[in-house]
Amino acid sequence: FKVDEEFQGPIVSQNRRYFLFRPRN
């Protein structure tokens, strides 16, 4: 995925944060 690194950058960070902070069910 190398289309808009400037736009996808922050989104990936948010996704990583969501996965890191999501409960382990």
UniProtKB/Swiss-Prot annotation:
GO CC terms, sorted: extracellular region
Residues modified to Asparagine amide: 25
GO biological process: regulation of smooth muscle contraction
Compartment(s) where it occurs, according to its Swiss-Prot or TrEMBL record: Secreted
GO MF, one example: hormone activity
Function: Stimulates uterine smooth muscle contraction and causes selective vasoconstriction.
Family: Belongs to the NmU family.
Protein name: Neuromedin-U-25
